[in-house]
Structure formats: C-alpha cells, structure tokens
C-alpha cells in the first residue's frame, strides 16, 4: 500500500502528532499492520491495522470486545496502583468524525489505530523460554479477566472457522 494512502487513513484518526513515516510491522498472516512513527519525541508512535473482515466478519463486535477487555484491565491495573498504563494495556484512538474506534473505507476495509507499546516484541520462532514466558503472560491476562462482568461476543464463528481463516490468508 502506498505511503500516501496510509497517511490519509491515519488522518481519519485523532492523532495529535506529526507523522514521519509509516512502515510494515511484523509479518502477520491475518491483518495488515503498520508502524506509524511520529516526529515529536514527546508523542507516542502508533500501530495502524487493517482488520481482515474475511476472518473477523463482525468487526464491530471485535472492537466492542476489545473495549470491554481493555476497560476492565485498565480498571484492574489502576486498582492495583499501576501508573504506567500505556505499557500494560492497549489504547485505541477515536476517529476524527466520531468517537468510533474504527474507520471503514468505502471498499469495505476496516482500520484501527492504537498507541504503540514501546519495547514490545514479537517472536517469529518459538523456543522453550519464550513459550514459557508467553504462557505466563497469557495466564496473567486470563486472571485479569476472571471477573469481567459481561458476556463477550464470539469473534469468529465456530462453523468452519479454520477453513475460513485459511481461505482468507
């Protein structure tokens, strides 16, 4: 995708910084993900992501679930005395037109923009140590959600889920 196209999508969100560059981030198989680097040192960088609506047909429900989960985790962290929330929980930016955290293009693509979490890493290869650390992190995540006070919607339907994912990627 062209830099100018990505820049125009970023401009649909309430970003207060000047964008310097936008480049691919990671090598995900499902969503298209880009790092949005800002010029100002006191402003965060961002992650721009095009959600694969072939895999996640109800994109609005995905974002509702994320809002519920991130709000709950944020409240739990505050109650525990955590002050550095930016490095512990996702923060999505609203669009400039409304408070929606999704931008829908005319051609049916959905985009979201979140604050980049500094020092976050992704592993392309798994070794026992990173698998153990991932398991611990996932267990901590599950513990944080143990008392979430609502029912989350199902993001990917159970029927032919695997087949749909493989077709979409």
Question: Where are each of the predicted segments found?
Answer:
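Juxta-kinase regulatory segment immediately upstream of eukaryotic protein kinase catalytic domains
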Residues: 1-24, 69, 73
């Amino acid at each position: 995708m062209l830099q100018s196209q990505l820049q125009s999508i970023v401009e649909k969100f309430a970003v207060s910084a000047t964008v310097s560059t936008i480049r691919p981030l990671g090598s995900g198989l499902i969503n298209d993900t880009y790092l949005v680097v800002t010029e100002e040192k006191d402003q965060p960088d961002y992650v721009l992501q095009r959600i694969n609506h072939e895999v996640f047909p109800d994109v609005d429900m995905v974002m509702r679930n994320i809002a519920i989960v991130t709000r709950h985790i944020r409240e739990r962290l505050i109650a525990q005395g955590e002050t550095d929330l930016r490095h512990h929980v996702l923060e999505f930016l609203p669009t400039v037109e409304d408070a929606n955290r999704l931008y829908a293009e005319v051609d049916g693509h959905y985009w979201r923009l979140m604050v980049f979490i500094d020092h976050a890493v992704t592993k392309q290869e798994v070794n026992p140590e990173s698998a153990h650390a991932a398991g611990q992190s996932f267990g901590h995540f599950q513990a944080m959600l143990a008392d979430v006070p609502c029912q989350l919607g199902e993001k990917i339907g159970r029927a032919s889920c695997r087949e749909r994912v493989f077709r979409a990627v």
